[in-house]
A protein has these predicted regions:
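S-adenosylmethionine/decaboxylated-SAM
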Residues: 32, 40-66, 84-277
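Rossmann-like AdoMet
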Residues: 1-8, 12-70, 76-84
Length: 277
């Protein structure tokens, strides 16, 4: 499950479809193909159908399921329709599948009255760091088994899923591989967003102002552990635009992410997740 918090979202304007290669709405949106191929004449499709076109391109590079993926994808469309300014930020990208999907959505659903969105992808790109004392026992046990080269049931399961590297690192997505994966979808699109890759533990990289966007429209947290999630919420939440979307992917999967989120909600006087998928 994931926790979604929408920040004082405004009303969605009605859409007026036109005929072009990507969805566009004459008063608010511009299709990247429109200027370069004015004679192009294929019927526009709603975002649900565009998701079904884009999802197969990225599914092999993410661990999340189709429902979670579509939630994020539709979020990008809603942000554009509502005129919410800001960048798209993902922390914990593994092999880049969700980053790829968000880039495709940002290219498909553009609001010409807004500055061009950038994408930010944060990860160690060397696998999950060691969980801390505020993370659940399961996470610590798996990490300890990997460090000791023990093939426990949980370790074996993750090896079968392709989540453990040959050198016993957990959830490794090398930065060169991720950049190649993301580039494979960006190269096919005009008007694609700029993608910033920030390498290192987020508790450290987020302390450098150069690594942090000034305004965020969509904030997706997927780093699993308590310390990273707590740092992300503390530093990035104040930059989330009114009407922006916060997604905590592992709210119901890992105790550390859930604890960090609930502590932050209490500190910020937020009553609780407003949508759980």
């Amino acid at each position: 499950m994931l926790a979604c918090v929408a920040v004082s979202a405004g009303s969605v304007d009605k859409e007026t479809p036109c005929r072009c290669a990507l969805p566009c709405h004459r008063s608010r949106y511009k299709c990247p193909e429109e200027a370069s191929s004015p004679s192009h004449d294929c019927s526009c499709t709603d975002s649900g159908n565009w998701f079904l076109i884009d999802w197969p391109q990225v599914a092999a590079y993410t661990m999340i399921g189709q429902l979670k993926a579509q939630t994020a994808y539709e979020g990008v469309k809603t942000l554009a329709a509502n005129g919410v300014e800001g960048d798209i930020v993902e922390l914990g990208v593994w092999k880049g599948g969700v980053t790829m999907l968000l880039a495709l959505a940002a290219a498909r659903f553009r609001n010409e009255s807004l500055p061009r969105r950038h994408l930010w992808a944060y990860d160690t790109f060397e696998g999950l760091p060691e969980p801390g004392i505020h993370d659940d026992a399961k996470a610590r046990d798996i990490y300890r088994a990997l460090a000791n080269h023990e093939n426990t049931t949980e370790v074996h399961k993750r090896k079968r899923m392709g989540l453990i590297s040959a050198d016993n690192k957990w959830n490794v997505g090398a930065i060169a591989e991720v950049m190649t994966n993301v580039g494979s979808v960006l190269n096919e699109r005009r008007a694609v967003p700029t993608v910033h890759f920030v390498r290192g533990k987020v508790e450290e990289t987020l302390l450098d102002p150069r690594n942090v966007p000034s305004r965020i429209a969509l904030l997706r947290l997927d780093t699993d552990w308590y310390a990273s999630t707590r740092a992300e919420l503390a530093i990035l939440w104040p930059r989330l635009a009114v009407g922006g979307l916060l997604i905590v992917d592992d709210y119901d999967n890992w105790g550390g992410a859930r604890r960090a989120t609930e502590e932050w909600m209490k500190d910020e006087h937020i009553p609780g997740p407003r949508g759980v998928v």
